[in-house]
């Protein structure tokens, strides 16, 4: 079997029990208002999502991922979303392959070199100017939304390469380690408050 399904029936049952246990914990903590009050999913929950394989689910096997089917992934996200909508949102947006698939193979190898359990957050719009320098692109700007950014390992931001005031080429995405990004907590909404978007 492939993806989030286990090789043996006993493993499959254990995996299912682990997922159900996590979903119960998520439900209980969501009911206390924890995620909404802090406006993001708690980092220990992100770590538990990593442990059960959410973020490696769609990562190619050559990078240590599970390569599960879209159906399997959607079923997993449905279960998490039934426990708490914000957790489901962050789990689905945090999977990196959909956003990073257009990157060069060497960049992907670098991103996944330590683990396939990489949590992504994207602050794509509005694209900000990125200064073209001899070393590459210097990225600086402010992006409005980035679901799951508080628990992300890497953050993708929309940029437009520029020299002076002139734009060079099409908009693209720069991928930055999360520890090199300043996050301003401006997320104050009624719905999906716990996503930290």
Predicted regions and their residues:
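DPxDG-like acidic metal-binding loop motif
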Residues: 142-181, 185-187
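Short secondary-structure boundary micro-motifs
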Residues: 11-12, 23, 31, 94, ...
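Acidic, low-complexity intrinsically disordered regions
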Residues: 18-19, 85, 183
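Alpha-helical interface subdomain recognition
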Residues: 1-59, 65-75
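Residue-identity detector for glutamine
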Residues: 12, 24, 38, 110-113, ...
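Internal glycine-rich alpha/beta core junctions
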Residues: 194-197
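Glycine-rich flavin
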Residues: 43-51, 56-152, 163-167
